[in-house]
Curated annotation (Swiss-Prot):
The lineage of its organism: Bacteria, Pseudomonadati, Pseudomonadota, Betaproteobacteria, Burkholderiales. It comes from Verminephrobacter eiseniae (strain EF01-2). InterPro entries: YaaA (IPR005583). GO terms for biological process: response to hydroperoxide. Belongs to the UPF0246 family. This is UPF0246 protein Veis_4789. Pfam families: H2O2_YaaD (PF03883). GO terms for cellular component: cytosol.
Length: 260
């Protein structure tokens, strides 16, 4: 079973790194280098228009593209789990994971990325911004979905190759999960949905749902879950499995009010 997360727009390259964390190298550096070459040819104004960014943010990312190197080091990069700093990763709380937790996560967690395709938790990454939905034209087509094509699905197949019942647990957003070519994927997909009670009905509230995805990833990591059925025991953040609203491919978790 493999857990799938989205990356985060917010990055943290300032907080001191915890000691003793191992690291690995992303699998698609050649493809990342090709994308960086295209981005380097764009002016900050063009980047602002392409990604709908403010002028200061576009200028920052133009500088990042120029500084990016195919070789990651301790001075120019950090592990993906430490670099990403959004709501999902607030829920995951990677800094509090043990060494055995990290080793398990490295084998059972994948993070989708517009620039890197797909990452393992300990892959070193450099500061960047490139969302999967960006309409960056390449030789493969007009957007990143066409650029990555079958590559991400084939990578996930490889990681699930030895699993007798390959299952991909989707904790990613739809924008990112669209990058997984379902026709090329040799695995069953199970989606986790997190709903909060508001206005008289249960509904997905983005901020809470993102954090809950990170909580679910943490739960699976710390409990070494290997089958989708085990996910039903998730109870972090006040959520509980809702069997009447679920089916085998869509596990729904609900809560009445946010945990204090």
């Amino acid at each position: 079973m493999l857990l799938l997360l989205s990356p985060a727009k917010s990055l943290d390259y300032a907080t001191p790194l915890p000691e003793g964390w191992p690291h690995s190298t992303p699998c698609f550096i050649a493809q990342s280098s090709a994308l960086i070459a295209l981005l380097r040819s764009r002016s900050p104004q063009q980047i602002a228009a392409l990604m709908q960014l403010s002028a200061p943010l576009a200028a920052l990312n133009a500088e990042r593209y120029q500084a990016w190197q195919p070789r990651c080091s301790a001075s120019n990069s950090r592990q993906a789990l430490l670099a990403f700093d959004g709501d999902v990763y607030e829920g995951l709380q990677a800094r509090t994971l043990s060494a055995p937790d990290l080793d398990w996560a490295q084998q059972h967690l994948a993070i989708l990325s517009g620039l890197y395709g797909v990452l393992r938790p300990l892959d070193r990454i450099q500061p960047h911004r490139l969302e999967m939905g960006t309409r960056l034209a390449t030789a493969a087509g007009g957007n990143l979905y066409q650029f990555w094509g079958r590559q991400i699905a084939e990578h996930l197949n490889h990681r699930l190759h030895d699993d007798p019942d390959p299952v991909l647990v989707n904790l990613a957003s739809q924008e990112y999960f669209k990058a997984v070519d379902r026709k090329a994927l040799n695995a069953r997909v199970v989606e986790c949905v997190f709903e909060d009670f508001k206005g008289g009905a249960y509904k997905i509230i983005s901020f809470y749902a993102k954090r809950a995805r990170g909580l679910m990833a943490r739960h699976a990591i710390t409990h070494r879950l290997s089958r989708p059925r085990q996910l039903e025991g998730f109870g972090l953040g006040g959520y509980a499995y809702a069997p009447a609203a679920s089916d085998p491919e869509r596990l729904v978790f609900r809560r009445k009010s946010p945990a204090a």
